[in-house]
């Protein structure tokens, strides 16, 4: 289990525990870049193994919705579960979706997550272009509740 997955589990557990909710009605995850470290490992395996005898685990864990799915499995949440991956706008769309679900009465509570990581190669790209270097790891979870 990579750093981001561990951080995702920890922050979501803390948010659920703090709100006395065992199973959220919905899980909405936002990510700008997804699980880059696992994606890079998968691409390296493709090159190293010449596209043969690849392990499916890295591929399955490289998709953006892996984090939200893992949290749903752990919390036994079989309801609404979606991941937004629209770059810097991901959290905004996740919050709008959570607000919509609550306002329409479809759910009473929503676990909203923001997860991202920065690999050394992404940091070097950012540095070369003069952009701000993203944090190595970002894992935040919070609960929105209908009154």
PLM feature segments, named:
Residues 1-28, 32-39, 97:
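Conserved active-site "lid/cap" helical segment
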